[in-house]
């Protein structure tokens, strides 16, 4: 017994000596160190505690049931706003019944066909939330395993209409607490003007409400029908999660929602094996002060989102013209709201939106100072250095254009780079574990991931003054 105790003492002494020999300089980081111990801890806890053992999971299959059918047919639904408004939409939802009436346009029908309803990325709800949605009330609890949404295809691209970039499906038993089922798979025959998004689950889930979230690609998305297949049942099935899921709320403006940065982030993390769910609270040109003000549309929406959902992370991004004197008072109000929700506040150190490339380093320096000071003052240890990554990429790979045609907003390429920086910063995802390329050439995507890593490890060489 004494020998065992002595051996254990020697082991602990060896470990202590080793740890003491490691200096802070052994770890290279950006200007603010990132402590991901909470993330690792949560992943470990989830794998051992939160995920139910496979043998305890309720596994019900329903496709062979004689009553299996599209249970959303002719059911009532709610949708987000149309464009330019619900009173005079360009592509209306006649009588609020077209999306579940069972009537589909032909594969050759025009986008103006009466079976289509149009969602636009410039509608108020889309700008605020980052998606348009249709929420079907099935009237009572059902067991469900297949979800379909019919949309116009990319055949209409010449007029600014395309298939959605993605359709994500959620279910709820009460219309308040939502469970994300996942992203639907796009199917479309060659030459067809009608496509569909399909999501099938291995086993049935229970729900009375089904929500289809449509994330845009071009400005317009034409939606023809939504379906949910299953059977009526009063048995509630506990929702099963096979992996840990982190929920993120992104607060900001077009620097966040242009080219769907949060959804690119979601695809990147999931390609690396980390499940995420994203929600937006954004508005074009918005300042954080407007979200902190509970009397504004943005402030009211943020309060609603914080009251309805517990988030793991809340990402904060301010207007390009904001300096510390603007951001600090807003953060004084926002941080207590974030902490009350139980979320971890993190920062998106924005890139320069100056349309003159020669002025971008000095403009980015202003953001660098502002966000780093905010991080220090509010003890925020995760500050995604997107500003650094843009400048590093411009230095190393000047042929890669990160900006949109307006030379101010980021492009789809810039969105991918931004999302990579956030995935690596917030969730400690390794550059080599990311397999999603966002339809970019593999070598270009690899270069962007490299720039993201460099931005996090060493940062851009900003001048001290």
Q: Which residues make up each language-model segment?
A:
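Bacterial N-terminal signal peptides
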Residues: 9-18
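Sec-dependent signal peptide cleavage junction
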Residues: 18-37
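N-terminal module-boundary/linker segments of secreted carbohydrate-active enzymes
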Residues: 58-68, 238-271
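Aromatic, loop-rich ligand-recognition surfaces of beta-strand-rich domains
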Residues: 59-69, 104-182, 193-240
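Predominantly extracellular/luminal regions of secreted and cell-surface proteins
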Residues: 60-109
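Conserved SGNH/GDSL esterase-like catalytic core that processes O-acyl groups on lipids
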Residues: 247-249, 257-330
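A short helix->loop->beta-strand "cap" motif at the edges of active sites that frequently abuts
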Residues: 336-345, 380
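Catalytic His-Asp segment of secreted/periplasmic serine-dependent ester chemistry enzymes
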Residues: 364-456, 460-462
């Amino acid at each position: 017994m004494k020998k065992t105790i002595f051996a254990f003492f020697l082991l602990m002494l060896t470990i202590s000596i080793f740890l003491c020999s490691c200096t802070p300089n052994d770890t290279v980081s950006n200007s603010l160190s990132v402590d991901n111990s909470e993330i690792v801890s949560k992943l470990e806890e989830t794998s051992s505690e939160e995920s139910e053992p496979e043998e305890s999971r309720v596994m019900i299959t329903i496709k062979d049931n004689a009553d299996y059918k599209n249970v959303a047919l002719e059911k009532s639904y709610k949708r987000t706003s149309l464009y330019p408004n619900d009173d005079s939409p360009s592509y209306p939802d006649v009588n609020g019944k077209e999306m579940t009436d069972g009537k589909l346009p032909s594969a050759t029908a025009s986008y103006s066909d009466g079976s289509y309803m149009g969602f636009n990325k410039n509608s108020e709800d889309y700008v605020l939330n980052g998606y348009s949605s249709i929420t079907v009330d099935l009237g009572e609890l059902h067991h469900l395993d297949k979800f379909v949404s019919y949309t116009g295809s990319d055949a209409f691209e010449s007029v600014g209409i395309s298939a959605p970039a993605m359709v994500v499906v959620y279910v709820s038993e009460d219309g308040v607490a939502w469970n994300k089922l996942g992203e639907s798979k796009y199917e479309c025959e060659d030459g067809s003007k009608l496509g569909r998004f399909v999501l099938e689950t291995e086993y049935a889930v229970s729900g009375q409400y089904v929500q289809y979230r449509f994330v845009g690609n071009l400005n317009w998305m034409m939606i023809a029908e939504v379906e949910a297949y299953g059977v009526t049942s009063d048995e509630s099935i506990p929702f099963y999660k096979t992996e840990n899921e982190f929920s993120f709320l992104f607060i900001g403006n077009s620097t966040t929602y242009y080219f769907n940065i949060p959804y690119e982030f979601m695809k990147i993390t999931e390609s690396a094996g980390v499940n995420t769910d994203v929600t937006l609270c954004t508005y074009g040109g918005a300042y954080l002060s407007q979200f902190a003000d509970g009397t504004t549309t943005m402030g009211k929406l943020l309060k609603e989102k914080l009251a309805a959902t517990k988030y793991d992370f809340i990402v904060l991004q301010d207007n390009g013209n904001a300096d510390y004197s603007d951001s600090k008072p807003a953060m004084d109000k926002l941080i207590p709201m974030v902490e009350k929700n139980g979320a971890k506040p993190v920062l998106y150190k924005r890139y320069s939106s100056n349309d003159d490339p020669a002025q971008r380093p000095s403009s980015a320096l202003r953001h660098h100072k502002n966000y780093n000071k905010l991080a220090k003052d509010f003890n925020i240890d995760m500050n995604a250095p997107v500003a650094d990554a843009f400048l590093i990429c411009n230095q190393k790979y000047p042929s890669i254009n990160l900006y949109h045609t307006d030379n101010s907003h980021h492009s789809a390429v810039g969105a991918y780079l931004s999302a990579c920086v956030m995935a690596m910063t917030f969730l400690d995802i390794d550059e080599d574990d990311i397999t999603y390329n966002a339809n970019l050439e593999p070598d270009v995507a690899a270069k962007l991931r490299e720039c993201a890593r460099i931005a996090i490890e060493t940062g851009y060489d900003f001048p001290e003054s």
